[in-house]
Amino acid sequence: MSRILFVFLAVMAIFSTSFGQQCGLNEEFKSCGSCEPTCAKPRVTICTMECKIGCQCKSGYLRNGEGTCVLPEKC
């Protein structure tokens, strides 16, 4: 019985993190993202490789000071 409960809770946790996440314009959900480039620091030189679950800018976009993902020329 406890094994079934564990499997059920594990499946629910996976579904709630991957399907319940809504990202903004030019963003995508990453289950293990890190070191997101920004307008202030477009090139990340040092990265800790720490997994951060959540929305990050799509490839080719940078996060501006307002928290929006924009093309580099819009910074």
Swiss-Prot record:
Keyword Zinc in the entry? The reply is: no
Q: Where is this site: Reactive bond?
A: M49, E50
Query: Which top-rank group of organisms is this from?
Result: Eukaryota
The question of whether Signal is a record keyword is answered with: yes
Bilayer-spanning residue ranges:
none
Signal peptide as annotated in the record: 1-20
Q: Which UniProt keywords apply?
A: Antibiotic, Antimicrobial, Disulfide bond, Fungicide, Membrane, Protease inhibitor, Secreted, Serine protease inhibitor, Signal, Target cell membrane, Target membrane
SS bond partners: C23-C55, C32-C51, C35-C47, C39-C75, C57-C69
- Show the GO cellular component annotation of the record: extracellular region
Localization (cell): Secreted; Target cell membrane
Q: Which Gene3D superfamilies match?
A: Laminin
Gene Ontology molecular function terms on file? serine-type endopeptidase inhibitor activity
The chain positions of domain TIL read: 23-75
Which tissues is this chain's protein expressed in? Answer: Expressed by the venom gland (at protein level) and expressed in fat body.
Q: Name one GO biological process term.
A: defense response to bacterium
Spell out the InterPro entries in the cross-references: Ser_inhib-like_sf, SerProtInhib-TIL_Domain, TIL_dom
PTM field: May be O-glycosylated.
- What's the stated role of this polypeptide? Antimicrobial venom serine protease inhibitor. Exhibits inhibitory activity against chymotrypsin (IC(50)=19.56 nM, Ki=15.24 nM) and microbial serine proteases, such as subtilisin A (IC(50)=6.57 nM, Ki=6.83 nM) and proteinase K (IC(50)=7.11 nM, Ki=7.02 nM). Has not activity against trypsin, plasmin, tPA, thrombin, factor Xa or elastase. Binds and inhibits Gram-positive bacteria (B.subtilis (MIC=29.45 uM), B.thuringiensis (MIC=91.03 uM)) and the entomopathogenic fungus B.bassiana (MIC=30.09 uM) but not to E.coli.
Family (UniProt): Belongs to the serine protease inhibitor-like (TIL domain-containing) family.
Entry protein name: Venom serine protease inhibitor BiVSPI
